[in-house]
Amino acid sequence: MTARAEYLDHEDFLYRSHKLQELSELGVVLYPYEFPGVFSCEDIKKTFASQELGNSEAAMSRSTPRVRFAGRLVLFRAMGKNAFGQILDHNQTIQVMFNREFTSVHGLSEDAEITPIKFIEKKLDLGDILGIDGYLFFTHSGELTVLVETVTLLCKSLLSLPDKHAGLSDKEVRYRKRWLDLISSREVSDTFVKRSYIIKLIRNYMDAHGFLEVETPILQNIYGGAEAKPFTTTMEALHSEMFLRISLEIALKKILVGGAPRIYELGKVFRNEGIDRTHNPEFTMIEAYAAYMDYKEVMVFVENLVEHLVRAVNHDNTSLVYSYWKHGPQEVDFKAPWIRMTMKESIATYAGIDVDVHSDQKLKEILKKKTTFPETAFATASRGMLIAALFDELVSDNLIAPHHITDHPVETTPLCKTLRSGDTAFVERFESFCLGKELCNAYSELNDPIRQRELLEQQHTKKELLPDSECHPIDEEFLEALCQGMPPAGGFGIGVDRLVMILTNAASIRDVLYFPVMRRFDAEKTN
């Protein structure tokens, strides 16, 4: 049996629910179907804030502009024959004035034993959604205000709002009940407006540069394209195991084979792994592939894209301050070109280790001495994996300004071409870092089907020998598509949520997701 939700026994819920019957008896329509022809608060302010509107007497004579808008009542105070309120519409508020002689309540019976102003004072509550028809004026202090001619109750709020001054301090409540967070904090609302704007900017930039947006399956028979554990489910219609995608890469490359020269997808990806300040199991990525480009051209494209986004949200400045870096606020300049270093150069620069002069055994000793890795973690590691581990443990946190770290060990990915110089120990891959976190991953894509099969089979064999590792299946359809012929191409993937964190100055990835992954709600516990 499902436990009874505790809010159903809250005093404010019971008190406000009782008012519903009273409102109905007074002739007020509960939960009307529409309130057409509304302005937004933002539009009203933009249109009229700089105009000469006159005072409340001019509004009383109906000689000022008439407006219709709707929103949530978030502040109310009675003052003699007038009462003032604040109406919240998304992330903007407008002051309203209710007048004893001027304001009426839509639907209130003419023979009701309560005046409109008393109805407003006694029957409305903070949190109610109201429709407002009225006339604009400026108060003596210069505040744009609407003298309410008619107020319409559009939705009765049965639960009280968070305290206006204290707000929501409990992060658990903020993330689980995001609607309260949005109502009580304009800053939170602005963050999500900016997130939507950033995603729109990304799409517009990609479209303007000739990329075609495509959609590929979220549910897949075979997962791949990244080193990650998938979420699994069962498709009843086919009696088969399915996976939520861990990457967009494989499906996009199949489309590239089909002839689309520039493609991208911006969508959800799922990885059944850890949760922390910069990781959520469900997250948004953009992956893009451009025929006839290589990783150097992709590098230029990525830094120009990010610079464009920074300028767009930062008043055309390329430099912004991120307040939540681990050592305190940090100013970062995203103006292209960004710093470029090979992985080996970055280890020499930031860790003081020239890997070329050390044996594998010496690199293992350095890792043992300078990191918290258990010795067993790299006892049988190849040289390339040792180099990658040195970078991850000793370098990445130091990359504060935007960096492209290029030429990674071949062991780090089976999907990338080796260096054209002939050094087969390293691949044409770069990762972009900022504030110690990875922003982008990019390759000169491997399009040799024979070599691709060899690498995937080698990876599969190694994974089978490791009992705790995720053994990815080999996607034969992908290999068949490569045999059809895929043009040389450059590709990249960017974690959109992590980028939005920086651009909105958010402390955690949870602050830029409407509903981040949380533990399952237990109705038996206190809300």
Swiss-Prot record:
Any Gene Ontology CC annotation: cytosol
InterPro entries: Aa-tRNA-synt_II, aa-tRNA-synth_II, aa-tRNA-synth_II/BPL/LPL, Lys-tRNA-ligase_II, Lys-tRNA-ligase_II_N, Lys-tRNA-synth_II_C, NA-bd_OB-fold, NA-bd_OB_tRNA
Keyword Cytoplasm: yes
Enzyme class per UniProt: ligase
Reaction catalysed by this enzyme: tRNA(Lys) + L-lysine + ATP = L-lysyl-tRNA(Lys) + AMP + diphosphate
EC number(s) per entry: 6.1.1.6
Protein residues bound to Mg(2+) 1: 431, 438
Cofactor(s) demanded: Mg(2+)
Protein residues bound to Mg(2+) 2: 438
Main localization category: cytoplasm
A single GO molecular function term of this UniProt record: magnesium ion binding
GO biological process per UniProt: lysyl-tRNA aminoacylation
Gene3D superfamilies: Bira Bifunctional Protein, Domain 2, Nucleic acid-binding proteins
Pfam families per UniProt: tRNA-synt_2 (PF00152), tRNA_anti-codon (PF01336)
Subcellular location: Cytoplasm
Cofactor: binding comment: Binds 3 Mg(2+) ions per subunit.
Keywords: Aminoacyl-tRNA synthetase, ATP-binding, Cytoplasm, Ligase, Magnesium, Metal-binding, Nucleotide-binding, Protein biosynthesis
Entry-linked HAMAP family: Lys_tRNA_synth_class2 (MF_00252)
Family per record: Belongs to the class-II aminoacyl-tRNA synthetase family.
Record note on quaternary structure: Homodimer.
PANTHER family: LYSINE--TRNA LIGASE, CHLOROPLASTIC_MITOCHONDRIAL, LYSYL-TRNA SYNTHETASE
Name of this chain's protein: Lysine--tRNA ligase
Lineage, opening ranks: Bacteria, Pseudomonadati, Chlamydiota, Chlamydiia, Chlamydiales
